[in-house]
Amino acid sequence: MKPLFAALSVAFLLGTSVSVHAAEQAKPTDRSVQVYKKADLAEWNRENAAGGKGPLLGRFAFNRHQTGAQDAFREIGWLTLPPGASIGEHKHTDNEDVYIIVSGKGLFTDSTGKQTQVGAGDITIARPGQSHALKNTGKEPLVFLDLIAETAAAKSASQQK
């Protein structure tokens, strides 16, 4: 119960909402699993993610609250931004965040403020110390795969600051 309370408290403090499947999210990742079937992915939706606008719809194999120090990949999931929705600019201090755009069109903003149109097949990355944002600029949902990885070197560097 404590992990669920902690997850909901963090979501409240960050101004986001977590779907009713949050209890599933608190379970540690079963490290013997090597295939995550789409039907079994846990739903985790947020409103106004990182100060963005509108819903961010997610289905995750696992998230950072379920992984341990031994895991490089901290989060893997399918994300969808409906038309007009966005993920606000946010900084990654001790991990890398990769978006692999599957369908739709969007505007990616990097840590320098440079904006780039992205679409199916494009890949974006925010490395430790970099920020990024993404907005759906099209008329169709913007669907992308989200991969967050953490390295010991990145974590060590962020803790030394």
Model-identified regions with their sequence ranges:
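Short beta-strand His + acidic residue motifs that chelate non-heme Fe in jelly-roll/DSBH
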Residues: 89, 108-109, 126, 132-138
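Bacterial N-terminal signal peptides
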Residues: 7-17
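Short, conserved beta-strand element in jelly-roll/cupin
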Residues: 78-82, 91-108
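Short acidic-glycine-tyrosine-enriched beta hairpin
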Residues: 113-128
